[in-house]
């Protein structure tokens, strides 16, 4: 007869815990107990064969209990709309009971059935305020697009060189578009009017720093600034331009220019194979996002 060990029969509950009821066999009979995950911030690894009940026994209790405790959740529903439907039910239920924090909303991002999806634009100055943030965004994006690639497999140093080059180049493009002709907006997403004055020497129009609710209107404080073309569709389209066009455009930003050194050197020396290795890697992976659905979702 299979025997197990004595397990916890007390419910260890706190404001962050997830408590899952269970049954176990001990000393000849089935007993009731609790699986108490008292510190979910340490991470929970769920392992089981397909159809073993991972979602029903672990994931769904997490959704139910964390929703009731006012947690913000990001749920990857690989069998949409199974989990999304249950999550929405608990969201509405707890909202009615006053357990959902004020301002908390329910949104879906769906790259297949876009009629269910909200639009989202992660390429904004409020998220990317310096080159370090742009590099982090670029690295995260490329790692996500390479999720099928085996870690540690490959050509070692040369692969790492091309990977780092791809990250740097994408970071340069992201930071350029984040800051190019930034425009002010209010908290409701309404575009405001930024006053400009013509420089008598260069004849270029430069912002004065004064923002109004409309031309000639009242002076206001913008909620955020957004680059004129600051979104993924414009960046992805820009990556498919000729190398000469790309370099000429990016060179106009003094902060971005230093990142372009290795690429410009390869281009001027006509080392096209090296250039394709550096930028071609980026183009191949980002091409996965070049769909009508992705463009609609990521458009500002």
PLM region spans:
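P-loop NTPase motor domains
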Residues: 23-31, 35-300
